[in-house]
Amino acid sequence: MSGKTLYDKLWDAHVVRENPDGSALLYVDRQLLHEVTSPQAFEGLRLAGRRPWRVEANLAVTDHNVPTTNRAQGIADPVSRVQVQTLDRNCEEFGITEYGMLDRRQGIVHVVGPEQGATQPGMTVVCGDSHTSTHGALGALAFGIGTSEVEHALATQTVVQKKAKRMLVRVDGQLGRGVTAKDVVLAIIGRIGTAGGTGYAIEFGGEAIRSLSVEGRMTVCNMSIEAGARCGMVAVDDMTIDYVRGRPFAPKGEHWDQAVAYWKTLHSDPDAEFDQVVVLDAAEIEPQVTWGTSPEMVVPVGGCVPNPFEEQDEVKRSSMGRALDYMGLQPGTPIKEIRLDRVFIGSCTNSRIEDLRAAAEVVRGHKVADSLTQALVVPGSGVVKEQAEKEGLDRVFIEAGFEWREPGCSMCLAMNADRLQSGERCASTSNRNFEGRQGQGGRTHLVNPAMAAAAAIAGHFVDVRHWPE
């Protein structure tokens, strides 16, 4: 009998019952909640006269709808205000810990969970949010669920799931200078496509992945969803354990020692078999820039906007044509000649302290291009913001002409005051470049934080490996 993959180990450890239809009832170790997908779930509990099964297993934050300026004045948009106030009331009524809008620990749920130690290796982690896959970077089985499942998890501490197939994405060798975790995952998506991971749980491995920091691994796992996967994960190593050590929710004393002993088993066995293996050479990965309306529409910064007529597949050719029309681009245009209106550094993909340090290093001593309407930096949490300010990063950004904001999802999605106007073009460190994602008619290009910072200074894309040119 062959060994087990990391996914197998995590799955098997949480199966409560296997169902006749092939699904299984999985125990949930941690549920994370936010204001958008939880109101109906709490109302369902209320109508049924139920209470959460394990109150302490839940943690709530406000992130999607919160303003990133003038918080003392409250939320201007009535719908957003109601959603945030509803989460506040629900958490108070049901006794759930919440980091509300004015709490220093507030931030994007997928930044807050790991930094507070609420996400730990070996856990099942669920949230009513597709990018819950982020938490797999810590060797957890983490995936997004729907609102009805949020209610089910609150009431029973379980969810029903079908087991996914197993994919290993191995990135061999070392990354070159200026190439980041964001470039790795965009290159992976460019290789396998946004449907390449459909039906799979992806384990990311190889020398390049192991050399990434835990925050870098979070960036990779965050976008496993954009590759179509159910979840993404990285095996536990000493770096993982050191990351969790001492955080507020982390085990203490002898419980820590017991946890570490278990966590060290959370890796795929040498003889484990995967349903599919994809291999990339790290040395071939360059800084990436998306040009279209899907994360798979991506090329190296030194490349050009592709020509749909060179695509043999009719469906792909048609979608490329539509994307070019929406993005207002011509085939053959060098990526470096694409001029920008706005730059956004933030989101659950790239708003952690390492991301802000990388961006600040590029920005230091420069000024935002006069041609830009706005350059925005939004820390992923209050904790990240405090650390950045302690290091003086806020001054670097502000002196260069960036806006330094309060934490939240911000311009990643058009659910708050930070959004693009129709026709505006944005270099963004977020994870989705769909039509209208950042605002109706807005045009999004996905890049890493240093690339976004350099683009803000130049007013167009540049190769950060040769910065300043």
From Swiss-Prot:
EC number: 4.2.1.33
Cofactor(s), by name: [4Fe-4S] cluster
Residues annotated as binding [4Fe-4S] cluster: 348, 409, 412
UniProt keywords, alphabetically: 4Fe-4S, Amino-acid biosynthesis, Branched-chain amino acid biosynthesis, Iron, Iron-sulfur, Leucine biosynthesis, Lyase, Metal-binding
Associated pathway: Amino-acid biosynthesis; L-leucine biosynthesis; L-leucine from 3-methyl-2-oxobutanoate: step 2/4
Cofactor, how bound (note): Binds 1 [4Fe-4S] cluster per subunit.
Record-level Gene Ontology MF annotations: 3-isopropylmalate dehydratase activity; 4 iron, 4 sulfur cluster binding; metal ion binding
Protein name from the UniProt record: 3-isopropylmalate dehydratase large subunit
Organism: Alkalilimnicola ehrlichii (strain ATCC BAA-1101 / DSM 17681 / MLHE-1)
